[in-house]
């Protein structure tokens, strides 16, 4: 198998899915039209509710949802071979992820941009709403801490990356102010993009100066700086920092992966990985479990991810200029993210299997595999860094992309530059999700505490916004600084996909209520059935074999208890949903004819 074949086939499948299935969801299932104003127009306040250009909204939404998942998940899942990850990315994104994202965004916009917990409360009752809100707040907290940990390791004692990431903040604020004043999006984007690229390319020079010494930060310092930054990102108006920064960052994200696609076509690397490895039944050095259910837990973003529900019921529904913008912003962004995941998978499987496992295993474990490294010593020398035992996926992606880029004409001597650039690129990729995620956590906190003190529910009340933003940053910032998260990614994988199940539950309820044909509910029920069974089995497997197994390396009673709580919350929500569906099925008066409520 070669990489070009995979890329061409994948792009064709995703394009057809967008054109046909995306249109079907918009026209037949959701019956979307532009006759009624969106929440951004109806509730415009110049701060949170702001009608925004379609492509700016796309850039913000894509930047927010495309965090570590489509990068790290496929890298780790390569342990099973290239085929399981490829199939799950394509099938999961088209049938599950794109549907999930568009129905969640639609459900939130119908309720004037309310969070998913508020929508669940309105549609399924107060108990389901409370369980949804509790699940969302729990997941967003560990997600922000987990994503930030990846950034910490990417920027630790890396002044080039720290400068390149940090400079995007004042550039974004300048773009936001300029666009707000002139309305000239093309000029603002062009100038901002040029400054962004300048910041990236002068990074190597900066690291040799006094400023570089100042930006050579350890993890503790970064663990304080990141929540402080996120506080301002969550408290400031969307148009000033969040939207323009994510919009500009999306240029870099899409640009890098277009370059990677070009590199794949030029180099046309073969895929030395087999379709299936010997670890599909479990016992692998990267992931302990079998290919099912762990392929669907390890690869979340890129296929289907509950984290997207935070953005789809948080910032994005308050930005869309027209209802029809949902197709490119939600459905389209999910399919683009799927392609990102496929490119990450190619970058990993373009390496020799022995080199891949040497990077993603500890030296002690790798010695037990009976493999011999092939190109890794040469790559380590060119990059100037010992690559063995650098687990977690981020370094593997950087090595894989560097391997492809340096195979292009005239680029063979730039390995160290490409490696550092990709590490920085990954940090920017993740920081944009932290921006939006912290703001969504702010909305959730305001919803919760607003039940006790009503003014807190007002998103335009400055003291309430400051309080909620500070509390959100304090919660995940404490976890980040203390480092007491343990096996965060396995716990996140289960809880994240459980939240995706909740999003599909809400979507199925809305579809049953408004669709002309009740069978359209299958667009949500089919992916929901698979995901709910998968996530519950994965949670059971982890609790039984890892979290509550004293002999397992990841033994953690706390993680076991938290996993059980999450599964119980999911069960309560789906029971409430089934009761609601049964009522609507029997009583047609509970269903509505209008596609968009008044």
Curated annotation (Swiss-Prot):
GO biological process, one term: cellular response to nutrient levels
Annotated keywords: Cell membrane, Membrane, Peptide transport, Protein transport, Transmembrane, Transmembrane helix, Transport
Location(s) in or outside the cell: Cell membrane
Key word Lyase present: no
Main location group: membrane
Entry GO terms, CC: plasma membrane
InterPro entries: CstA, CstA_N
Membrane topology per record: Multi-pass membrane protein
Chain segments annotated as transmembrane: 6-26, 62-82, 86-106, 132-152, 159-179, 191-211, 222-242, 254-274, 291-311, 328-348, 391-411, 414-434, 461-481, 488-508, 521-541, 557-577
Pfam families the UniProt entry points to: CstA
Known role: Involved in peptide utilization.
Family: Belongs to the peptide transporter carbon starvation (CstA) (TC 2.A.114) family.
Protein name: Peptide transporter CstA
Organism: Bacillus subtilis (strain 168)
Lineage, broadest ranks: Bacteria, Bacillati, Bacillota, Bacilli, Bacillales
Gene: cstA
